[in-house]
Amino acid sequence: MSKIIGIDLGTTNSCVAVMDGGQVKIIENAEGARTTPSIVAYMDDGETLVGAPAKRQAVTNPKNTLYAVKRLIGRKFDEKAVQKDIDLMPYSIVKADNGDAWVEARGKKIAPPQVSADVLRKMKKTAEDYLGEEVTEAVITVPAYFNDSQRQATKDAGRIAGLEVKRIINEPTAAALAFGLDKSEKGDRKIAVYDLGGGTFDVSIIEIADVDGEKQFEVLSTNGDTFLGGEDFDQRIIDYIIGEFKKEQGVDLSKDVLALQRLKEAAEKAKIELSSSQQTEINLPYITADASGPKHLNLKITRAKLEALVEELIERTIDPCRVAIKDAGVKVSEIDDVILVGGMTRMPKVQEKVKEFFGKDPRKDVNPDEAVAAGAAIQGSVLSGDRKDVLLLDVTPLSLGIETLGGVMTKMIQKNTTIPTRFSQTFSTADDNQPAVTIKVFQGEREIAAGNKSLGEFNLEGIPPAPRGLPQIEVTFDIDANGILHVSAKDKGTGKENKITIKANSGLSEDEIQRMVKDAEANAEEDHRIAELAQTRNQADALVHATRKSLTEYGEKLEASEKEAIEGAIKELEDVLKDGDKAAIDAKVEALSTASQKLGEKMYADMQAAQAAQQQAADEAKPVDENVVDADFKEVKRDQ
């Protein structure tokens, strides 16, 4: 049975792990790194680059290099958070026909799950290369505060990448799994997981208990902000640099996409450097030019300056911590361990703020980049039956309910309810002889339904005529272990029923997902074709170079017609190398090999002659000593 891999699909970086021989193995990618940038670039020749290769060319291809797409997944174009990103991203964010936020590259509209699927495909391939077998199943992590639409969209991304998503689990929960199974501490412990990643922030309060030799992980509460992370920290630095440069040079870099991409790279680098040093220098020659000539950017940033720029962002993480503690029904002093997850938690100011709130130093023995993928791999081994000593009880992060008379949100399932769960409630009609009811489903904490996230709606029709308040409509909410919602409505009088799995009320339709799966398969073939063509070109190029070199050395030993034939074959191969397909190049390679046969024979004959001459010279050079005497000896036997 093939293994279920664990994937941390991050905003900035992704990571893949697997349980191997009872141990979690974080798998290195083709570039030798344990994490992969969640960046996808679409090239003009149709090739798709993922990870470090995509990141390397971002400066020269900013409009077609997509990063931080996780911030858009499962979101509406009109959402405030999306509108804010439109002005900041060098690539285009566009409105899809269904109202979702999509991106555009090479003149084509692309759904965020498609972009995420490209990253997931790279993680799948990384795992397959390590395991030496095909991988078809995965556990994928999401921020704990992701709503239903965002979870569905992540599941869709997995399907497009050719993976059956066995479970969607929350990132802080996964980190707690990795921490809890790695440590030998006995007894019950309450831990806080503070997860500040590239695009999202989560905090979860989790109880780890030993129950009859089994480790039980129970999430008591979760809270967060799905639009707060390292990308926002980078943006503060970029805005500061743009402001300083404008003051100094009078040039506004915010409209120059090429400059912005270089600034993005420099800001991220500066932020990382300032976690270990007090000062860093941003040096970007030829950042732009005006009538007076090229302009260079040179700016020193201190750690204190960075902390001042991002202080408000760090402060924004504390309120969710407060709410999570309150919802869990615990005191801060009852928290035994604080675990930091996500690259941003390496920033000293973040660690300081966490210590200030929780009153204790956070643990330093958890790898913030790898813990989430490790936990996902552990959950994968639980689902495949390899591990039986772990029980995971997660929660739904936000309340779920329906809109009732007066636009009120009637909550069916409260936030932080352990999942899977099921809840039913009976409602009735608002008007006399009402033939149908519309069930509108919402997710959120506001009292008025319109203030919450609309997840979808459906009708229950064929209600027999009756005075208002008389028909009995039973509405049932059912959340599965992935945190995905199924809703049904039943007329108790007639037994008529209608049910839906809540798809994001836009989201991707089944047809669209199938089309994207087929596109992905076709792309895999196209990628294979491009790679094969590149290899053929390289080999042909090497042959041209080697033949030319040999022709220079041995050409005079050939007949004029033989030499001309080789030169003609080289020219034909070079012509076809520019834009020919694999078959055309192969044919010309064959022709050059045939034409070069005589040249090969001459080279071989020359080498043989040279070796013979060398051997002869060596034999002649051996010294002859006339005073050598043959030894004469006789065996003497001793008495025993």
Swiss-Prot record:
Keywords: ATP-binding, Chaperone, Nucleotide-binding, Phosphoprotein, Stress response. Induction: By stress conditions e.g. heat shock. Signal peptide: none annotated. GO terms for molecular function: ATP binding; ATP-dependent protein folding chaperone; unfolded protein binding. Residues 619-640 have a biased composition (Basic and acidic residues). Transmembrane segments: none annotated. InterPro entries: ATPase_NBD, Chaperone_DnaK, Heat_shock_70_CS, HSP70_C_sf, HSP70_peptide-bd_sf, Hsp_70_fam. Residues 614-640 are annotated as: Disordered. The modification Phosphothreonine is found at T200. The keyword Ubl conjugation does not apply. CDD domains: ASKHA_NBD_HSP70_DnaK-like. The keyword Cell membrane does not apply. Pfam families: HSP70 (PF00012). Belongs to the heat shock protein 70 family. Acts as a chaperone. This is Chaperone protein DnaK. It comes from Bordetella petrii (strain ATCC BAA-461 / DSM 12804 / CCUG 43448).
